[in-house]
Amino acid sequence: MIRLQNARVPIEGCAVLPAKPNPDARGCLYEIYRAEWPGSFSTVQWNACVSKAGVVRGVHVHVDYTEYYTLLSGRGLLGVHDIRRTSATFGQSVTIDWRAEDRSAVVIPPGVAHALWFVEDAILAFGLSQYWRAEFDAVGCRWDDPALGFEIPDGVKNLSRRDSESGSYQEMVRSYERFVSGDNDTASEMAAAATSIAAA
């Protein structure tokens, strides 16, 4: 496990963008995103995610958009795992101890599976390079699949129905590879899964 502060995420395409805090007697102002920063990208949608301690979000992998994560409060463990066969870091994993005081953002490209375990109550803000669509957010696997190689914290896990019912790591990899190859049947399966997500 590594600390995010001043760290490099050893997965191809995953960038850490440190913010520069500007503290004064009132508190602190710091920029969380600038399109001109090295490793940054254009975003079209921003979301805020409020999570309680013990919540797990993931494991998810996106097929057509990049995410920009920044932790505004609290602490979490971020696990990332590369499932892109053409990547120099294919099959590699890292678990990151991420704290709001690190004042850093993490870029997660398509094909990198990821999950967040919230050790404390936390607020996560994240930007997307394309608008979110449920049918393109249905690829994932169980958070505790040993093939991921994540260092999983102890404690009660609170998951969505979707995440608790996710399949295996191998199923996730097959779905991802079929989708990026243009398999129309997989797209239909994902659309059906999206309906289940919306109903959950």
PLM regions: where:
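Non-catalytic, conserved peripheral segments adjacent to functional cores
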Residues: 1-101, 131-200
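Beta-strand residues in well-ordered beta-sheet regions across diverse protein folds
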Residues: 71-72, 79-81, 107, 117, ...
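Conserved metal-binding segment of the jelly-roll/cupin
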Residues: 98-121
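Short conserved catalytic/interaction loops centered on acidic-Pro-aromatic/His motifs
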Residues: 113-141
